[in-house]
């Protein structure tokens, strides 16, 4: 009887405990195999001018909540576009609150509030055009949906962007494709801060600062993340290219 009770107790204990399989599972690393932290690999900036990186880094801000990555990305790029200007003492830098007030869009205000759905790539393009006008920045916005994977075409865009201080890219992607965290399987946006052509990788200033810091991903990984389908928009994600025209 005692042996039977012992056996029953052992079984119940195993069932009640997270135990063998679940408890033994190792937690996922902060970054999956697709991403490499800037802290671990910054040699590129010792050997290259990296004009976009230096224009953006002073304005690298966190998103305010899980829905406002477009807003934080816009703030970084708008400030970077004005980095070469001599602003007056009365002129504020672009902030997330200030940007929402000046653009005054119900879509941007409501969709980037806590719990909101965020904005699609096409919505973001229209909002960026309004933001450029509000801040009197002479620039155009180009929208590219990655409907077909073409790494060579993307490399050409990245190379031109890296050599030009007057244009910036904002990627729209499925975050889990980069970080490896299945909890991050959501649409996301982040500026491209640098392109290391020799290594075939890009640096992203991910505004999800609660969890991440700047990280590198390969061109192929970038393309895979941008080529995912935005279910709400009904088409593939992609990127914005914002180009000064003056």
Predicted regions and their residues:
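Noncatalytic regulatory segments and standalone regulatory/sensor domains
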Residues: 196-246
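Active-site-adjacent substructure of cysteine-protease-like catalytic cores
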Residues: 148-205
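Positively charged n-region of N-terminal signal peptides that target proteins for export
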Residues: 1-4
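Signal peptide processing junction and immediate N-terminal pro/mature segment
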Residues: 17-24
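Extracellular structured ligand-interaction cores
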Residues: 64, 189, 237
């Amino acid at each position: 009887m005692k042996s039977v009770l012992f056996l029953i107790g052992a079984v119940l204990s195993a069932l009640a405990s997270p135990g063998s399989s679940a408890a033994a599972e190792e937690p996922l690393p902060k970054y999956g195999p697709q991403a490499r932290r800037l802290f671990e690999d910054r040699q590129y900036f010792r050997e290259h001018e990296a004009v976009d990186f230096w224009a953006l880094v002073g304005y690298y801000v966190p998103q305010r909540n899980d829905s406002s990555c477009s807003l934080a990305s816009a703030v970084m790029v708008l400030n970077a576009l004005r980095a070469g200007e001599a602003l007056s003492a009365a002129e504020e830098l672009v902030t997330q609150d200030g940007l929402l007030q000046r653009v005054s869009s119900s879509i941007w205000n409501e969709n980037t509030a806590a719990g909101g759905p965020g904005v699609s790539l096409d919505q973001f393009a229209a909002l960026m055009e309004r933001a450029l006008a509000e801040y009197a920045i002479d620039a155009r916005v180009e929208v590219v949906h990655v409907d077909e994977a073409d790494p060579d075409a993307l490399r050409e865009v990245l190379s031109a962007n890296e050599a030009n201080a007057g244009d910036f890219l904002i990627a729209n992607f499925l975050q889990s494709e980069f970080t490896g965290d299945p909890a991050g399987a959501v649409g996301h946006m982040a500026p491209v801060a640098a392109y290391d052509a020799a290594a075939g990788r890009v640096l992203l200033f991910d505004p999800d600062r609660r969890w991440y810091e700047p990280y590198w991903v390969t061109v192929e990984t970038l393309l895979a993340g941008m080529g995912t389908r935005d279910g709400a928009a009904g088409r593939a994600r992609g990127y914005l290219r914002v180009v000064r025209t003056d």
